[in-house]
């Protein structure tokens, strides 16, 4: 029975820490809201660079059809 209480306490502690890691940077949210995707490398055609992600560490790319 003690193990059950210990397990519940540990799980409660772990789930308390989770929301801090789920908060995204504002630029990442803006990229996703404009239907872009984050990329480690430069955007490849037909995608265009529309901003940054992860606090400026990544590129935000959006597919742009060629006309």
Curated annotation (Swiss-Prot):
Q: In which family does this protein belong, per the annotation?
A: Belongs to the beta-defensin family.
Q: Please list the residues that make up the propeptide.
A: 20-25
Signal peptide positions on this chain = 1-19
Q: Tell me, what's a Pfam family for it?
A: Defensin_beta
List residues traversing the bilayer: none
Q: Taxonomy-wise, where does this protein's organism fall, top ranks first?
A: Eukaryota, Metazoa, Chordata, Craniata, Vertebrata
UniProt xrefs under Gene3D superfamilies:
Antimicrobial Peptide, Beta-defensin 2, Chain A
State the compartments where it is located. Secreted; Cytoplasmic granule
Q: Does the keyword Ion transport apply?
A: no
Q: Which cysteines are joined by disulfide bonds?
A: 31-60, 38-53, 43-61
For this record, the Gene Ontology CC terms, alphabetical, are: cytoplasm; extracellular space
Q: Which InterPro entries match?
A: Defensin_beta-like (IPR001855)
- The primary site where this protein sits is secreted
Q: Which UniProt keywords apply?
A: Antibiotic, Antimicrobial, Defensin, Disulfide bond, Fungicide, Secreted, Signal
Does the UniProt entry include the keyword Signal?
Answer: yes
| Function field | Has bactericidal activity. Potent activity against C.jejuni, C.perfringens, S.aureus, C.albicans and S.cerevisiae. Less potent against S.typhimurium and E.coli.
Q: In which tissues is it expressed?
A: Strong expression in the testis, liver, gall bladder, kidney, esophagus and crop. Also expressed in the glandular stomach, ovary and male and female reproductive tracts. Low expression in the intestinal tract. Expressed in the ovarian stroma, but not in the ovarian follicles.
Kindly provide the name given to this protein in its UniProt entry.
Gallinacin-9
Its GO biological process annotations read: cell chemotaxis; defense response to bacterium; defense response to fungus; defense response to Gram-negative bacterium; killing of cells of another organism
Whose protein is this, by species?
Answer: Gallus gallus
Q: Name one GO molecular function term.
A: chemoattractant activity
